[in-house]
């Protein structure tokens, strides 16, 4: 008669539980050792009792086996992440490709190409899009033209202001030059007679550089022909010649 099936549940009796733990622990360690020897497998076994006591077995060392385990887990995780990222990029590329093809079809339709497969409703939508685009283009053109006109008006106002300033400057300079010309004319025509000597004042410095001042003694000399001189002497009143000589003497 065989053994009955043992029900798997926690053993309430503390002593029985400790005895069962010791027996099965030893059996598990033995099985792990046998597996590593018979199958040339790298086996690591870690057991903690209910009191926290550690029992372990490692055919190649617990630390080495754990490092190998972590390395395999991380590589598998990295591989899974790389695979997931690759799939995500592939789906994204597929979406972008489909969107690009749709944009190309729309562009051809807007240019009046490949209109055969379109239905009446699609053609009406295309017509509305073209009308909207044409309206926006006209509005933009009008806006640019208005901006250009405003810019030209602004430049016109600036040029007008510059013209007024130049005109005012020329008027000021013209009045100044006229005043200087009149002053120079008065200087050229004015003569100072003092002590029987007539001294003509020279023009300003700029004119004085071109001509030298002249000093005239006596009355201004005028060329008179011989006949006229004889007539003047005959018709001159008495004492006029004496006055003329006195002018030279003085």
From Swiss-Prot:
GO cellular component term of the entry, any: nucleus
Effect of gene disruption?
Abnormal and almost sterile florets. Mosaic organs and disturbed identities of palea and lodicule. Extra carpels or spikelets.
Say which domain of life the source belongs to. Answer: Eukaryota
Nucleus recorded as keyword: yes
| Keyword list, A-Z | Activator, Developmental protein, Differentiation, DNA-binding, Flowering, Nucleus, Transcription, Transcription regulation
The function of this protein is: Probable transcription factor. Regulates floral organ identity and floral meristem determinacy. May be involved in the control of flowering time.
Q: In which tissues is it expressed?
A: Expressed in the floral meristem. Highly expressed in lodicules. Expressed in palea and pistil. Weakly expressed in carpels, empty glumes and stamens. Not detected in lemmas.
Gene3D superfamilies registered for this protein in UniProt: Transcription factor, MADS-box
Name the chain's protein: MADS-box transcription factor 6
| Record carries keyword Metal-binding | no
K-box domain sequence ranges = 86-176
Self-association or partners: how does it assemble?
A: May interact with the K-box of MADS1, MADS5, MADS7, MADS8, MADS14, MADS15, MADS16, MADS17 and MADS18. May interact with MADS13. The dimer composed of MADS6 and MADS18 forms a ternary complex with histone fold protein NF-YB1.
Where the record annotates domain MADS-box, the positions are: 1-61
Task: Name one process (GO BP) from the record.
Answer: stamen formation
Q: What is its main location?
A: nucleus
The terms under GO molecular function for this entry are:
DNA binding; DNA-binding transcription factor activity, RNA polymerase II-specific; protein dimerization activity; RNA polymerase II cis-regulatory region sequence-specific DNA binding
Q: Please give the SMART domains that the UniProt record associates with this protein.
A: MADS
Gene that this polypeptide is encoded by: MADS6
Localization in the cell: Nucleus
* UniProt source species: Oryza sativa subsp. japonica (Rice)
């Amino acid at each position: 008669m065989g053994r009955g099936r043992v029900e798997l549940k926690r053993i309430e009796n503390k002593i029985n539980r400790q005895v069962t733990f010791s027996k099965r622990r030893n059996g598990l360690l033995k099985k792990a050792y046998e597996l590593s020897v018979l199958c040339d497998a790298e086996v690591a076994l870690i057991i903690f009792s209910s009191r926290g006591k550690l029992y372990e077995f490692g055919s190649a060392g617990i630390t080495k086996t754990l490092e190998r385990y972590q390395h395999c887990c991380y590589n598998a995780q990295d591989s899974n992440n790389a695979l997931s990222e690759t799939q995500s990029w592939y789906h994204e590329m597929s979406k972008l490709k489909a969107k690009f093809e749709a944009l190309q079809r729309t562009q051809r339709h807007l240019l009046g190409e490949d209109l055969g497969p379109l239905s009446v409703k699609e053609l009406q939508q295309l017509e509305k899009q073209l009308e909207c685009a044409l309206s926006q283009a006209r509005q933009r053109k009008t806006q640019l033209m208005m901006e250009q006109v405003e810019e030209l008006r602004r430049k016109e106002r600036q040029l007008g202001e510059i013209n007024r300033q130049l005109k005012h400057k020329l008027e000021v300079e013209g009045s100044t030059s006229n005043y200087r010309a009149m002053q120079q004319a008065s200087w050229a025509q004015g003569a100072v007679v003092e002590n029987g000597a007539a001294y003509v004042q020279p023009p300003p410095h700029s004119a004085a550089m071109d001509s030298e001042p002249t000093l005239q003694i006596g009355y201004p000399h005028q060329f008179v022909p011989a006949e006229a001189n004889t007539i003047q002497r005959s018709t001159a009143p008495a004492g006029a010649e004496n006055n003329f000589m006195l002018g030279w003497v003085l």
